[in-house]
Swiss-Prot record:
Is a secondary, electrogenic Na(+)/H(+) antiporter that catalyzes Na(+) uptake and proton efflux. Makes modest contributions to pH homeostasis in the alkaline range of pH but is not contributor to Na(+) resistance. Appears to have a repressive effect on growth and on alkaline phosphatases production in the presence of sodium, by affecting the transcription of the phoP/phoR two-component regulatory system. It is found in: Cell membrane. It is a multi-pass membrane protein. InterPro entries: Na/H_antiport_NhaC, Na/H_Antiport_NhaC-like_C, NhaC_Na-H+_Antiporter. This is Na(+)/H(+) antiporter NhaC. The chain crosses the membrane at residues 9-29, 36-56, 71-91, 109-129, 137-157, 193-215, 257-277, 320-340, 353-375, 429-451. The antiport activity is markedly inhibited by both valinomycin and CCCP, and modestly by nigericin. It comes from Bacillus subtilis (strain 168). PANTHER family: MALATE-2H(+)/NA(+)-LACTATE ANTIPORTER, NA(+)_H(+) ANTIPORTER NHAC. NCBIfam families: antiport_nhaC (TIGR00931).
Length: 453
């Protein structure tokens, strides 16, 4: 921020609320994608910054620096799109889908999705890896079994984000513990206080949702037709699962995400050359670029196996660029710091401090769309207040995870939200009501802050 320019708290609140009104009204009243509303917010905030005396060079630098911070998420999203195309063509996702359709009852699908994604995400410590592997296959199963896709997406995301929050392998778990300067397992143990109640409520809710899914003869016949359609059109072989297995093993070894995804793409290409009889280099590269185009008379099967490719992620890539531009601009003109400074002045109790931490993490998520900033900025800002009031920092780190890690997938322009929507083919606004774990945890965190002394 320019040293001679400083926004006041009321002005920062006004600008922030006005931007949210633009975005929310466009999303819910006009039913448009979030790209242009975010772009309008960038234009509005740039004009306001010029009005308040910020030079254009400073505004431009904030926008450019923000986009620079989004380069890694953009690369990851692009690689995941390519990987899904590779796994579709090689047969990895069709094989997982066929096996799952053969053994999972439709009424049990939601709980199966929840617990299987919990296990994988805890092992690998990454919601993105979990969703791009088993999550995509489970969406295919739901499509064939007649289970609402938004319900299944909710279960997949709840399970995937459980590991993002609780796994010692997770980047965000280690990052939050590092911000609070506390041991990782002390941080994880303390998070049990909000995680276990939220998980139990989530399990109960998905149980009742799953119980409402019928498994009649027509549904069974439809599933068999989908299985036949997939087998006739795509490659179904257990050998294709070696590539997802490699990705999971590398993630468990804590190899960085970009090499992991690249290894998945390369290994899939090798397996395709060996085990896919109809393969050609041209067709494989086309699948990596544009996704698969298998021909089948079964419409449900076609929707499951014709997906992926680099181009499928371009909408999310452009969304993240605009969101990071907005976040960089807000940070450059001091809007975020002005909001946090104003919030901190009104804190008088432990409950208010915990609530302010959670809400600030949510606010930074909304402002920047970036998970790490939603942990870093409130964490650094509130750390001294926890020390001053003799409140253990594990309350800080838990609040950062509940408001930072878990909320990002609920924001259409957030990195995780944009990825989840693209990978699963379900808009964020559609799956939000069913991501119970993600919004129950912050509520419990705030409640405990006021109740537990």
């Amino acid at each position: 921020m320019d040293s001679q320019k400083k926004l006041t708290f009321p002005l920062a609140v006004g600008l922030f609320i006005f931007m949210l009104c633009i975005i929310i009204s466009c999303l819910f009243l006009l039913h448009v994608e979030p790209h242009i509303p975010l772009f309008l917010s960038v234009v509005m905030l740039s004009a306001a910054a010029l009005w308040f005396g910020f030079p254009w060079k400073s505004i431009e630098k904030g926008i450019v620096d923000g986009i620079k911070n989004g380069v890694q998420p953009i690369i990851v999203l692009a690689l995941i799109g390519i990987l899904i195309g590779a796994w579709m063509y090689s047969g990895a996702i069709p094989t997982m889908t066929v096996y799952a359709l053969s053994f999972i009852e439709p009424s049990h699908l939601l709980l199966t999705a929840l617990f299987s994604c919990m296990i994988i995400s805890t092992l690998v410590g990454s919601s993105l890896t979990t969703v791009s592997t088993i999550g995509v296959a489970l969406i295919g199963v739901a499509s064939a079994a007649g289970v609402p896709l938004e319900w299944t997406a909710g279960a997949v995301i709840c399970g995937a984000c459980f590991g993002d929050k609780m796994s010692p392998m997770s980047d965000t778990t280690n990052f939050a513990a590092g911000i609070g300067e506390i041991p990782i397992f002390e941080h994880i143990r303390h998070m049990m206080g909000t995680t276990i109640p939220a998980l139990l409520i989530t399990v109960v809710l998905f149980y009742f949702l799953g119980s409402s899914v019928s498994a009649d003869a027509a549904s069974t016949d439809n599933i068999q037709q989908v299985i036949t359609g997939i087998k006739d059109a795509a490659n179904v072989t257990p050998w294709a699962l070696l590539s997802p297995l490699l990705v999971v093993l590398l993630a468990m070894k804590r190899v960085s995400v970009i090499p992991v995804l690249t290894a998945g793409i390369i290994s899939s290409g090798i397996l395709t050359a060996i085990f896919v009889p109809y393969s050609s280099l041209q067709a494989f590269m086309t699948a990596l670029q544009n996704g698969t185009t298998f021909e089948t008379d079964n419409e449900a099967a076609a929707k499951i196996i014709n997906r992926g490719g680099l181009q499928s992620m371009m909408g999310s890539v452009s969304l993240i660029m605009i969101a990071f531009a907005l976040g960089g601009l807000m940070e450059k003109i001091g809007l975020i710091s002005a909001l946090l400074e104003g919030v901190m002045k009104g804190i008088r109790s432990k409950g208010r401090l915990v609530a302010a931490t959670v809400c600030s993490s949510i606010g930074v998520n909304l402002a920047t769309g970036e998970q790490y900033l939603s942990i870093l900025i409130p964490g650094q800002s509130f750390k001294s207040l926890y020390d001053k009031r003799n409140i253990q920092r594990k309350f800080l780190t838990r609040s950062l995870e509940d408001g930072g890690t878990l909320i990002n997938p609920l924001i259409p322009w957030g990195v995780s939200g944009a990825f989840m929507a693209s990978a699963l083919g379900v808009p964020v606004i559609d799956y939000i009501p069913f991501t119970f774990f993600l919004y129950i945890s912050p509520m419990i965190s705030i409640l405990i802050g006021f109740v537990k002394k």
